[in-house]
Amino acid sequence: EDPVGTDGLVTVRAIIPKGEIHADNLDALAEIAEKYGNQNLYTDNRQNLSIHGVEPKNIEKVKNAIHELGFRTEGFFGIRDIVSCVGTTHCPKAVSGTRNLFDALLKITQESKYDLIQKQGFINITGCPNSCSPYRIADIGFRGMRIRAEEEGAVEGYEMLIGGNEEAHGKKVGDFKSEDIPNIVRDLLDLFLAENLNKETIREFIDRKGLDYVKSKLLYEEIK
C-alpha cells in the first residue's frame, strides 16, 4: 500500500534498479513531483525514490507517469527490492561485479510463483568486505570475493549468508562461484515457499528450521 500522511496526502514510490537513474529520468521524476507532489524527491535505504504529498485523486496519474519512465511502483521492501553496491563497475575496492548478480536474482524473484512470499525478506549484495550494502543483516546476503577453483584458478564468487537482520548477523551457507548462485537462491526460495508458516520472514524460517536443515535441501557445490 502507498503510505498516507496525517494530512491525508499519499507517498508514491519508484523502484530504482541498482540505485542508478539516468539524468533525463531524474529530471522527469522531478517534474512529476513538481506537478503532483510537494516538489521534492526523497531517497530511502533501499536506493529508491519517492514523491510525497500526492492527492489521492492523482495517484494513478503519478504511477502511470512513473511506469512510462520504465520504473516499477510496487514490490518495495521485499525480495524484489534488491540492494547492491556499485561493485567493480566503479569501485576500486570491489572484487565482484554485483550488477550481474543483481540482474540474475531480480529475474528469479519476479517469477509469479514468488508473489506469495515477496514481502517476507530482503536481499543485499556487496562487492567487498566493506559491506556498503550491508549483507550481514539481510535475510539473504552476498559478499563478493575471489575464490580458488581447481581448473579456473581465481574466479569471481560470493560468500552467502542467510537469516540476518538488525539484531543478528546472517549464518554462512558457503562460498560459491557467481554462476552457481542464482540456482542456489531459487532452491532456497522454493524451500521457503513450500515450508514457511504464518507469513514468517526468511530469517524466522532459518531460525525455526535450522541452518543445517536448510543447507541439506539446497543443491550446490561449495568451494572449499
Where in this protein do the model-derived segments appear?
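Mobile "lid/hinge" segments at catalytic clefts and subdomain interfaces of large enzymes
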Residues: 6, 136-198
